Amino acid sequence: MRKIGAFLLLLFVIFSCGKSGNNDKTNKEKGTATKNEQDVMNEIEKKKEEVEKYNRYVEVYNNLGNMDGRIIRYFEEAGNEEKVRKVKGSFPVMHVNQSTIDNVKQNLSSKVKMDELDKAAKDMLPYIEEVKTLAEAMESYYEGKDFVSDNYAKAQEMHTKFLAAVKKYSETTSAFKKAMEKQDKENKVQAIEEFKKNGEMVRYNLALQMKLNEDFLAEIDNQKLDISNFTNGNVEKFKELRDKISKQYEETEKILANGEELKKEGYTNSVAIASFKRKMTEFKGSTASLINRMETKKKGESGEISNSFYAEVSEGTPENVYRVFNEVVREYNNLNR
């Protein structure tokens, strides 16, 4: 599952509103703000609250991806059938981040309304909490090796409850993810247009690069490809998208080497810039590796297919493209802090 860039909308709103609000803010601080100026400041504050709430939902979305991965690894060990399979190796870490629950609760109590996202978040909250409770109980059970004394009796009981909870969790989080992805797509299109119009060429090129990267992942989704079937996909579609990524990559590299423009837009963290460039290059390479494996029909090996970790770290798999992209998102967010 891909991640959404948390800081894109935040930068867009504050910068675009701030242009008209800087003088008004000065007047307000002097105690001389007119009614119109006060209205502008109130609008900026309202937009800021909206962005903060949206970014909390982005964090929730990203954390759901981590939860999904842990659930998959549990089922790889214990099975997803009614009868639990005895876990022979170390039990997979099942920790569910408390901040996910806290962010949902904070957003649901917010005065800012986002009807579609709020409804989906409210529906999924009890199942996230249930999965968290069960995951912690199972982790404690396996770490304490209680299965030695009860011959997996408690393991079976928790596994049965976990299967039911995950079913509801998957149904409700799916609705939330779809709502987030729809909103994120709209936000990115709007932001790219505004960045270009305002002459913010660093932000424009970064946002466009991220959009093209996401288009590549969207095609993986559209073709329903994973480690088990990706060599059967339409490779020509990916070549077209790879060419667009490569062309924009050259423009992004140029703008990130433009010290004057970087300084003008507030990009002064050279370490963050270098880290983003490295991950951006790695992502471009991961798309090339996927295309190469598709063209040479190098199918997924049994170890890659049976274990999600190996699928993610093996070059040229859809799962690897996703993993590297998620790391690009992390560096993109760090760059825009």
Label each PLM-derived region with a short phrase:
Residues 2-8:
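Sec-dependent signal peptide recognition
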Residues 13-16:
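C-terminal motif of bacterial Sec signal peptides marking the signal peptidase cleavage site
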Residues 18-20:
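Bacterial signal peptide processing site
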Residues 25-87, 156, 160, 167, ...:
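Immediate post-signal-peptide N-terminus of mature secreted/exported proteins
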Residues 69-150:
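Post-signal peptide N-terminal segment of secreted/secretory-pathway proteins
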Residues 117, 122-195:
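Acidic/His-rich structured neighborhood in mature extracellular/periplasmic domains
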Residues 159-280:
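Extended amphipathic alpha-helical interaction segments
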Residues 239-337:
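A cross-kingdom marker for long, charged
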